[in-house]
């Protein structure tokens, strides 16, 4: 069962970046990826942001770093045969110097279908789960932020609809994971900002993640690399210019301990400054601690 928690850990680089600035890709989907009937997960992440990359790809190190902490609760449940549903709720705390803000992040609801079940052993066929996800604008967007350092920006703040798939494969002590998602964020009007009344129009985004690991009895060691992309945001009706497309790559190393099939605990390190050619994004480094409880069918 250790590889199942690792699948969730693959999304944490994006989550760390989302907490540290203004949102990345879709929130972490709450999924049942094993043979259990339901699971409940609790994740705490701590990230620091010390570098910004502008639209031309030029890096600038911050004189004062920002700290972001996220406490996230996830639950997923099989509702009928190969169908399932899940939800995730994040609480975000951001700090810079003595200034601190805490608020609700973007809540996500998702439904999944296991389109490639693993009923018979195959040396090559993976297990496949597709999902759709609805993201609610419960977090405060960067355009609504009133704090001078924009620390009260706790999410993207847009309705978003996405679809994705997770493929997992185990061969002996080794496992591999492929994750893909595509999502569309929908525009909204933001009134009463210092720049005037704004019409904000985001676009498409996507994530591609590859991961692999090896198990040693009750312990699993793994790594992953994720590529995240977001379209430029169009802004009209005020004095703000349009945004620019955002992209970055995030690496993660994880250690998972699972003494029984019913629960797992993990620690992971994520770094967004090691790979790729980032554009228009802050870069974060962070540590994440997770616990997952699984309930058998």
What are these regions (language model features)?
Residues 43-47, 90-92, 114, 133-137, ...:
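Outer-membrane beta-barrel pore domains and translocons
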Residues 18-69, 137-141, 272, 296:
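Short glycine/proline- and aromatic-enriched beta-strand/turn motifs that initiate or cap beta-hairpins
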Residues 42, 73-77, 87, 109-115, ...:
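Residues on the lipid-exposed face of transmembrane beta-strands in outer-membrane beta-barrel proteins
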Residues 36, 67-71, 102-107, 126, ...:
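Residues that define the transmembrane beta-barrel architecture of outer-membrane proteins
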Residues 99-202:
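Outer-membrane pore/translocation modules
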Residues 45, 50-62, 191, 195-297:
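Outer membrane beta-barrel transmembrane domains
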């Amino acid at each position: 069962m250790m590889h199942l928690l690792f699948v969730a850990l693959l999304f944490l680089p994006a989550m760390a970046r989302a907490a540290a600035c203004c949102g990345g890709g879709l929130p972490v989907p709450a999924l049942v990826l094993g043979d259990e009937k339901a699971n409940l997960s609790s994740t705490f992440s701590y990230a620091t942001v010390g570098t910004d990359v502008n639209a031309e790809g030029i890096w600038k190190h911050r004189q004062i770093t920002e700290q972001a902490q996220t406490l996230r609760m996830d639950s997923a449940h099989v509702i009928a045969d190969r169908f399932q549903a899940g939800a995730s709720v994040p609480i975000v705390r951001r700090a810079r110097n003595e200034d601190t803000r805490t608020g609700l992040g973007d809540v996500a609801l998702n439904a999944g279908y296991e389109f490639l079940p693993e009923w018979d052993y195959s040396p090559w066929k993976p297990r496949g789960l597709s999902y759709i996800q609805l993201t609610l604008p419960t977090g405060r967007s960067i355009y609504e932020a009133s704090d001078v350092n924009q620390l009260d920006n706790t999410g993207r703040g847009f309705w978003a609809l996405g679809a994705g798939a997770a493929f997992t494969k185990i061969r002996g002590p080794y496992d591999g994971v492929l994750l893909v998602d595509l999502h569309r964020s929908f525009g909204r009007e933001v009134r009463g900002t210092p720049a005037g009344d704004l019409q904000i129009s985001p676009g498409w985004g996507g994530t591609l993640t590859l991961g692999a690991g090896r198990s040693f009895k009750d312990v699993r060691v793994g790594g992953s690399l994720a590529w995240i992309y977001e379209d430029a945001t169009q802004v009209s009706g005020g004095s703000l210019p349009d945004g620019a497309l955002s992209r970055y790559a995030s690496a993660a190393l994880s250690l998972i301990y699972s003494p029984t099939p019913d629960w797992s605990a993990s620690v992971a390190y994520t770094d967004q400054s090691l790979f790729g050619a980032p554009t228009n994004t802050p870069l974060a480094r962070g540590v994440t601690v997770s616990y997952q409880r699984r309930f058998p069918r």
